[in-house]
Amino acid sequence: MRVIVHLSDIHFGRLDPALAARIQQAIVRIAPDLLALSGDLTQRARKREFLAARAFLDALPFPRLVVPGNHDVPLHNVFARFVTPLARYQRFITSDLSPVYRDEEMVVVGVNTARSLTVGEGRINARQVLEVVRHLKGEPPDRIRIVVTHHPFDLPEGVKEARLLGRARMAMTQLAAAGADLFLAGHLHLSHIGHSAERYKIAGHSALVVQAGTVSTRSRGEQPSFNVLRIERPNISIERLVWVAEREVFAEEAASAFHHTANGWVRSN
């Protein structure tokens, strides 16, 4: 079995330092095999925010895979935004914008969907898709295949279609053919679990599309939260841990279980 902590939209600069410590404590207790961070580590891509994010990560002694979000690109510094958009991210977090994690049970591929030309929304291009496909297709058939982006492949009910990852349909067609099982994203500050089959309707393919909420003060009506995934093919459970201020703990609010079938992943609870 593999355990992944899926954390997104930390937004250092808009994160209570006391809560950051509680998040670290919760993650240490879980002791995940991988920490997956799906972007927006900072609020305005400032040096001090990246330094705080790096210190936060360095205190967690677990393998990690990180991708940038749109807030990790400078907003007000026009030169930096268009010429060196991810220079601070690459200096302080990781130089790798196409990270890959592999072990005996899963392969996890990260994609940079942040773009200088858009303020909020993101995009995936054909070259990136081909690179992800290459990694996914090269794995044994029983290995779980996971893709991590900041911008989402699916949307919770009521969210405008404009918030969807740019060129998502093109990407999903090819990633489905490569056997993608699971998509992790953030950006919306809303928790969500969906099936790719509901939106994309690709015959014989139904991947899980999972959104993490935010732990920052930039909430959208939800309490600070993150996800814990427990993966043991053909089963995946997804737990949502939510901050309970009265008890000063992250507690499980919801758990969903899924089972893999000939047509993809289906809910089993």
What are these regions (language model features)?
Residues 1-59, 75-76, 96-97, 131, ...:
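N-terminal active-site segment of His-dependent metallophosphoesterases
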Residues 230-269:
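A short C-terminal boundary segment appended to hydrolase-like catalytic domains
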